[in-house]
């Protein structure tokens, strides 16, 4: 059980990547689905069995700002489930998709309250903030799987609107305050990822 207890929440980014690769390399989608599903259940087990440490980790800025990758992963995960066993799988898949959206919207609200409206510090701004504010566009990318493109457009609009202020804020932070801890430097690669997400929606 130590494996579950010590499981870093940052693994949710890996889960998102695995599910995404399954959509790109369709001939290996089953393999990616199985690996990603196992990791999802490990994260859920940590939430259930080690709830206090789980929530304590999320009480910090960096883990919370990156945890949106879990809600995004759930949205992609739901698209794998939908075709499996009709019609039950469709209902379950839609439920997971909605849960993913609710989790992500909750992250936006909590993160904004804790780190934007209160305790704001420009040096605590990282590219991972885009996971919080632009990650909701994953709902737009996956909405067509449920014939809900009209609702997906709303989530795309939310992400697109939030893109501009976060672009200015994040860019200003990196240009003006160049001192960044080594462990937080890799977040800069998120620049490419989330503009790609917006392009995929258009």
Where are these regions (language model features)?
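N-terminal signal-anchor module of multipass membrane proteins
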Residues: 1-49
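Juxtamembrane helix-loop boundaries in multi-pass membrane proteins
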Residues: 1-20, 52-79, 97, 113-141, ...
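Helix-coil boundary and interhelical linker segments in multi-pass alpha-helical membrane proteins
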Residues: 22-29, 81-92, 141-153, 202
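Early transmembrane hairpin module of multi-pass membrane proteins
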Residues: 28-39, 49-68, 92
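Structural signature of hydrophobic alpha-helical transmembrane segments
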Residues: 29-41, 90-105, 150-165
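Hydrophobic, membrane-facing alpha-helical anchors
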Residues: 40-56, 100-117, 162-174
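A generic, well-ordered mixed alpha/beta core segment in the N-terminal half of proteins
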Residues: 79-115
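Conserved helix-loop functional segments at active or binding sites
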Residues: 83, 145, 170-173, 177, ...
């Amino acid at each position: 059980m130590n494996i579950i207890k010590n499981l870093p929440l940052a693994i949710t980014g890996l889960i998102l990547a695995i599910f995404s690769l399954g959509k790109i390399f369709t001939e290996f989608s089953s393999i990616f689905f199985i690996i990603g599903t196992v990791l999802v259940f490990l994260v859920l087990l940590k939430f259930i069995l080690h709830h206090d440490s789980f929530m304590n980790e999320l009480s910090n800025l960096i883990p919370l700002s990156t945890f949106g990758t879990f809600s995004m992963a759930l949205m992609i995960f739901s698209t794998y489930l939908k075709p499996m066993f009709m019609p039950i799988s469709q209902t379950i898949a839609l439920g997971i998709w909605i849960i993913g959206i609710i989790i992500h919207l909750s992250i936006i609200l909590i993160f904004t309250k804790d780190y934007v409206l209160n305790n704001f510090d420009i040096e605590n701004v990282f590219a991972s903030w885009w996971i919080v504010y632009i990650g909701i566009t994953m709902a737009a990318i996956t909405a067509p799987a449920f014939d809900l493109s009209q609702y997906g457009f709303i989530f795309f609009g939310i992400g697109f609107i939030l893109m501009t202020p976060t672009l200015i804020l994040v860019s200003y932070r990196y240009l003006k305050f160049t001192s960044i801890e080594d462990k937080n430097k890799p977040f800069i690669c998120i620049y490419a990822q989330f503009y790609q997400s917006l392009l995929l929606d258009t």
